[in-house]
């Protein structure tokens, strides 16, 4: 649990540019692996000649889904949005494009996830933090912070009435405006222990064909054994797509990223958003910075201009940093640069 400042700090300057780049590079694989809903970039009309614009692809995808099961809802959000501001959910494609064209900057339109796993009938998302380090010319290492949070909406979920932001947007900055904010859980936040309870309850509620399509058929999924490993796989895939964009000169560099996920009613982990400047509570931030510093400063400095080629390749730059057992950043994988 977090202090009362959590609602002011867990929402952050979200940058969906990573989602855009990931969808561009990994679109076919994402659909196949089922971890990223269809995502399209919408450029301002006067900048179409200079910026990728996918509105035709969006309209085609929208038409293909029309009449199929579900409401065919999509969500529009700025690539530089934050705190849930200027987000629109709608099942009307033209209204979404009209909304975007009235706004400034570059936008993305993403298929809205209509069948989320719920807690007491309410929607939630999962925020995780990931430290990416690059201390040599070959690889980026990724570490996952062990304490994630669940952000929960105030009202019961309905796959309709998409203008009701208290139902469909879990951002704390949005939810704190509802009279029931904090009624069900402090600051509308839960932790990974709570997620295990949710997963267990959900498993017990499955029937027939539902359990046939569930990732685990012998037991409930758990955060440690099922959700976090899948999250780490997805994060590593996104880093492969944007490694040159994120760390164009990856020597002696690091970056902290915040990822937002949702879990579907069938147990699938879905990437929703990536944040370049993720926020958190002051208490967690202090612990996080201390743990980050230990990992970042543990690596030896190597001047890339004095060491190159085989010397750099042979140097122990790729080693897993030593850290105290209480460090909450857990080593989660490597990406070739």
Pin down the residues of each PLM region:
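Hydrophobic/aromatic hotspots within intrinsically disordered, low-complexity regions
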Residues: 18-20, 35-36, 42, 317, ...
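Asparagine/serine/threonine-enriched low-complexity, disordered tracts
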Residues: 3-16
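Non-catalytic terminal/accessory segments
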Residues: 313-337
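Eukaryotic N-terminal low-complexity, Ser/Thr- and Lys/Arg-rich leader segments
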Residues: 14-19, 28, 329-337
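A donor-sugar binding/catalytic signature common to diverse glycosyltransferases
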Residues: 260
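Intrinsically disordered, low-complexity serine/threonine-rich segments
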Residues: 7-9, 22-23, 30
